[in-house]
Amino acid sequence: VSAAVTAMISDSVREQLLTRAMAFVGASIGVSFTFSLVISPILADSIGVPGIFLLTALLCMLAIGAVLMLPTAPVKRFENFRARAKLRDVFLHSQLMRLNLGIFSLHMAQMALFVVIPLRLAELDLVVAQHWTVYLPAVLVSLAFLMPVLRHAEKTGRTKELFVGAICLVLAAFAGFEIFDNSVLLISVLLLVFFSGFNVLEASLPSLVSKTAPQECKGLALGVYNTTQSVGVFIGGAAGGWLYSVFGTHGVYGFCAALMVLWIIAAQGMTAPARGNVEADS
């Protein structure tokens, strides 16, 4: 689903506005993620876990209805042998490999982190029903800075610098968790730092993939990108649980920080996509 959505946006939005369009998608994902953390305990108490799955199915049906009302976009067709060649090219494209490594690492780290943060908050005597008081402000404040920062980076041609800076911000958050996870207030501040970097990366990565991939295989490149993201989510959840059981919270923080260090090293070889003209009224 996420691959189809990002591919549709890539095909429908002008390149000058692509990063901001992806930012809106990333912001909606961030708000949805936070809302799920807030509402899940309430739903679990009222309708139970089976009810949550039924609610998810209902929301999927509503999403299908919304998609059916969209106008049909023109389809570009390619021969099968060309599609196979392009799949190989997408996997072996050095710049796309760096971006795919990035989204894999980012979501692996996010899932591993949120294996332990709820447990740590509970250890600090914050009841589950009050966890939203930590998550929601961190996400909303971080989103307030997202669009101005992205717009400035686009206009000044400093997309790569912003990208690497956002990774460093996430790394700083994990380093902070290693030292300052002993109070709810400090965890709240560090989550704000984390989401400030995370939201920039979440918005920038699909746009960079779309701009980097060859024109005829953007959808394929975004499909590989989203698959890599999903694999990162799965492995991150599993790795976070195992690391917590063996090494505790600090083992998880250290693992996430190591992922960000590796990503920063890989990102040094990135080449920023050609800068498009930014319209004055955009």
Which role fits each region the language model picked out?
Residues 1-28:
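Cytoplasmic helix-loop-helix junction between adjacent transmembrane helices
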Residues 25-68:
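Helix-loop-helix hairpin linking two adjacent transmembrane segments in secondary transporters
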Residues 45-58, 242-260:
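A membrane-interface helix-boundary motif in multi-pass transporters
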Residues 58-76, 266-270:
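C-terminal membrane-cytosol helix-exit motif in multi-pass small-molecule transporters
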Residues 71-102:
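Juxtamembrane intracellular "pre-TM" segments in multi-pass secondary transporters
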Residues 115-130:
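Short amphipathic helix-loop junctions that connect adjacent transmembrane helices
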Residues 145-158:
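Helix-to-loop junctions at the C-terminal end of transmembrane segments
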Residues 161-175:
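Structural signature of the two symmetry-related core transmembrane helices
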